[in-house]
Amino acid sequence: MPKLGMREIRRAQLIDATLRSIDEAGLSGTTLASVAQRANISTGIVSHYFGDKDGLLEATMRHVLRDLWAATARHRAAASDAPRARLRAVVAANFDDTQISAPVMKTWLAFWSQSMHEPTLRRLQHVNTRRLYSNLCAEFAKALPPARAREAASGLAALIDGLWLRGALAGGPFDTKAALKLANDYIDLLLAPRA
């Protein structure tokens, strides 16, 4: 009889092993066997919990997305109600420590690539994209006319993704300060009174 709570402990252990495997070997080098080896368990147990490699990647991305959404909630809770502060909080969440470790960044890159081919991952990516846009649009709408708010939200979402992508591909530590400064300067520019 399995121990109470063992399922969640085992799943977390396997997700961590997946993140490490993608970090060290890339998605193509990550197999159920390589994850099992890193977790020091049998391949059969990995199959039992996730079915196949796609199921494992989906569960890993759901974990990373939950971390992102939790970071967004944390940063927004700490911000004032002013749109500028709330927008900066959403930006900060996207560059939160939970999102910029090498294993997580490499997993995001693998996820983006696979989401073009795998419907389940595409749906997850769509949910994430819509959530970011919705959060940004809601805050911009407090300070800008509707059409400008939508345009500003699209622009800031693209900037966040672009800064994150460049940082992930830079090959060194992620420069959070520089990314935050660029994104926050863009927010200031968008919210500046027009002449």
Swiss-Prot record:
SUPFAM superfamilies: Homeodomain-like, Tetracyclin repressor-like, C-terminal domain
Residues within the DNA-binding region(s): 31-50
GO terms assigned for molecular function: DNA-binding transcription factor activity; transcription cis-regulatory region binding
Key word Ribonucleoprotein present: no
InterPro entries to which the protein is assigned, alphabetical: BetI_C, DNA-bd_HTH_TetR-type_CS, Homeodomain-like_sf, HTH-type_TetR-like_transc_reg, HTH_TetR, Tet_transcr_reg_TetR-rel_C_sf, Tscrpt_rep_BetI
Pathway: Amine and polyamine biosynthesis; betaine biosynthesis via choline pathway [regulation]
Residue ranges of every copy of the HTH tetR-type domain listed in the record: 8-68
One of the protein's GO biological processes: glycine betaine biosynthetic process from choline
Keywords: DNA-binding, Repressor, Transcription, Transcription regulation
PROSITE patterns hit by this protein: HTH_TETR_1 (PS01081), HTH_TETR_2 (PS50977)
Keyword Cytoplasm: no
Job of this protein: Repressor involved in the biosynthesis of the osmoprotectant glycine betaine. It represses transcription of the choline transporter BetT and the genes of BetAB involved in the synthesis of glycine betaine.
PANTHER family referenced in this protein's UniProt entry, alphabetically: HTH-TYPE TRANSCRIPTIONAL REGULATOR BETI, HTH-TYPE TRANSCRIPTIONAL REGULATOR RUTR
Protein name: HTH-type transcriptional regulator BetI
Natural source organism: Burkholderia thailandensis (strain ATCC 700388 / DSM 13276 / CCUG 48851 / CIP 106301 / E264)
Gene behind this protein: betI
